[in-house]
């Protein structure tokens, strides 16, 4: 009988759980991996190499290359067509039509800011675009329109003699692709008391539209309108004291000075001898300092009116369509449109809400509509709006609930719905928000987070891999083990398991798009557009590093004798792997494992086969193979690191033959 220390022992690993970087390689579970890249650990004996990326082609079969440097990648749906949209650093935007493969311009250079643009969707009619500084726009598949919508309409002269409601005509929008605004007048005691918006329109700007009131049996009624744009750096004024004796609106002058900007202008609306409000005829631009913005009133026959200047300096940071409205976040304020409108932010059912919660530190970072909630993300908090309704007076009501007072995210493009949860990444983990419960799901990635470069954008989205809906987070990562360099990788999550993919070392932006009903991930590397995981036959570098196994006895030294790797190839005839045998202190030279069959002649010489092009060909077999080799390694713990560039195969198991040696 062999001595105990010379008895051969065996270990087989087939239950694949996924990546675990939280603990040392010697301390993770035996069926976990200390690194698993471009291999999806689907289940027992089934770890499948993921497809590589494929270049997106236009109608002429040419690679899709954006005209300028990409600053944001997103997608939208117009009618039944899905688009990938690239916003660029020169302020332009371009589209790629997923159905027809056509490319084209969404907007010319200078339309948008060079960074910070975010988007949402209104029905399947148009993409909603929020620029951090230039305001709110829409794109309907043909034209970008600035949602300068008609704002407050103030009656400057009530007129007299009206026996019925007069007709109100609002001037045409400045943008020829805008939509016409409409309003209705209300009469009280023979005078026009109120002009109410029916449709706020779009494409309005400076100067604001004219308001014409006619008919109704009376005369003399006049009104003026302002415009809502959500542009920052603009100025407005509120009345602190209305003063007395103001009777002549024609020569009442409102003057803006200071504040760092220019061109702000407004018209005073009088009533009862007082200044009642100021309608901005030009909000100006470049205003930054409300403290030294001075607004004065002169003329009009009165005295004592005091106005306060307001500067809109809050950066636009979130947009979402929810409950039949558009919600826009800026600073700590949420603006919401009227019911069933994407442009009307003035009517009675529209409004704004300032988050005064102490749990919101700083400003809102992002908003997201999903699962019948509107999620309001702060850097370290999450609120939800729900139960949106309109009361009998037409006022919009909703419930505001804080669901997380300690965890949030400022990574606006790494927040997205996944099944019935919302997943989000922050600087110390990845979390799932299910209902009102936030839980960390990235414990297995704790060893990676110190090496993530948070100075670069982080994007995320859903993707279907091997008929499994996965969540993928794309970030720039310093790989200190395999490449000793920064590269972009994707941390992919499904069924409580993580693995890593690499779909291009310079893949900076990604976005999810449904293609023929399948959730697909597109990305940009440089200025080129790619469909990720779209090429199952292209070479792709896969890396699998098992746990360092104690072989049931961590005290005794193990002498590795052989290793084996079970793999199945369904569409390629051969697989070549480079494998090392590892211990807690060292790593063997690489062993080449291959399924190629060598032909030997009667003289025991290898027969080399050539094709018609005089290229050497190999003989292999499709299906299951056991790739095995003698091994030389010793240590308290033993594991395998295997790399390959072959696509389309499945790891079925990892096998070890070893002998137990001395204790301690």
Residue ranges and their predicted role:
Residues 96, 171-173, 214, 335-347, ...:
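Predominantly extracellular/luminal cell-surface or secreted proteins
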């Amino acid at each position: 009988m062999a001595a105990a220390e010379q008895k051969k022992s065996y270990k087989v690993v087939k239950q694949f759980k996924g990546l675990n970087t939280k603990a040392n390689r010697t301390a993770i579970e035996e069926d976990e991996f200390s690194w698993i890249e471009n291999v999806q650990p689907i289940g027992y004996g089934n770890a499948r190499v993921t497809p590589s990326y494929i270049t997106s082609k236009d109608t002429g079969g040419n690679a899709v290359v954006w005209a300028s440097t990409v600053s944001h990648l997103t997608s939208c749906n117009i009618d039944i067509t899905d688009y990938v949209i690239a916003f660029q650093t020169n302020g332009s935007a371009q589209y790629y039509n997923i159905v027809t493969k056509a490319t084209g311009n969404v907007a010319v250079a200078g339309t948008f800011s060079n960074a910070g643009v975010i988007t949402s969707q209104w029905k399947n009619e148009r993409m909603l675009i929020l620029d951090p500084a230039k305001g709110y726009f829409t794109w309907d598949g043909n034209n970008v329109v600035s949602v300068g919508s008609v704002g407050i309409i103030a009656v400057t002269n009530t007129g007299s003699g009206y026996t019925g409601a007069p007709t109100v005509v609002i001037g045409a929008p400045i943008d020829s692709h805008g939509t016409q605004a409409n309003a209705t007048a209300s009469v009280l005691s023979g005078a026009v008391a109120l002009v109410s918006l029916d449709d706020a329109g779009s494409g309005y700007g400076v100067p604001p539209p004219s308001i014409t009131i006619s008919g109704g049996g009376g005369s003399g009624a006049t009104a003026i309108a302002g415009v809502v744009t959500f542009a920052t750096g603009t100025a407005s004024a509120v009345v602190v004291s209305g003063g007395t004796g103001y009777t002549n609106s024609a020569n009442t002058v409102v003057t803006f000075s200071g504040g760092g900007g220019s061109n702000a202008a407004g018209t005073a609306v009088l009533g009862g001898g007082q200044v009642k409000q100021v309608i901005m005829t030009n909000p100006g631009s470049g205003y930054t300092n409300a403290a030294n913005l001075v607004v004065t009133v002169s003329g009009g026959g009165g005295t004592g009116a005091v106005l306060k200047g307001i500067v809109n300096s809050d950066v636009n940071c979130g947009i979402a369509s929810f409950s039949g409205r558009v919600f826009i976040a800026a600073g700590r304020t949420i603006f919401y449109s009227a019911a069933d409108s994407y442009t009307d932010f003035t009517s009675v059912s529209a409004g704004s809400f300032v988050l005064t919660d102490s749990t919101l530190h700083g400003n809102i970072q992002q908003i997201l509509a999903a699962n019948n909630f509107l999620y309001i993300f702060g850097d370290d908090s999450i609120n939800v709006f729900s139960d949106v309704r309109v009361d009998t007076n037409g006022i919009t009501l909703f419930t505001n609930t804080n669901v997380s007072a300690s965890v949030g995210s400022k990574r606006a493009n790494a927040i997205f719905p996944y099944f019935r949860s919302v997943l989000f990444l922050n600087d110390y983990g990845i979390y799932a928000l299910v209902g009102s419960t936030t839980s960390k799901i990235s414990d297995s990635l704790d060893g990676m987070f110190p090496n993530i470069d948070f100075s670069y954008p982080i994007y995320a989205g859903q993707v279907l891999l091997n008929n499994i809906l996965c969540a993928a987070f794309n970030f720039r990562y310093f790989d200190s083990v395999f490449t000793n360099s920064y590269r972009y990788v994707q941390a992919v999550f499904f069924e409580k398991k993580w693995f890593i993919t690499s779909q291009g070392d310079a893949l900076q932006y990604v976005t999810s798009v449904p293609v023929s009903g399948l959730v697909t991930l597109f990305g940009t590397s440089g200025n080129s557009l790619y469909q990720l995981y779209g090429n199952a036959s292209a070479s792709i570098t896969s890396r699998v590093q098992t746990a360092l196994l104690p072989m049931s006895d961590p005290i005794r030294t193990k002498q590795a004798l052989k290793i084996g790797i079970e793999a199945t190839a369904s569409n390629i005839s051969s697989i070549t792997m480079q494998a090392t045998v590892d211990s807690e202190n060292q790593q063997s030279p690489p062993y080449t494992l291959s399924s190629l069959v060598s032909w030997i002649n009667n003289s025991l010489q290898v027969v080399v086969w050539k094709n018609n092009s005089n290229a050497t060909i190999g003989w292999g077999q499709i299906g299951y193979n056991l790739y095995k080799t003698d091994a030389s390694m010793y240590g308290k713990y033993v594991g395998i690191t295997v790399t390959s560039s072959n696509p389309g195969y499945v790891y079925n198991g990892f096998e070890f033959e070893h002998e137990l040696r001395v204790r301690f």
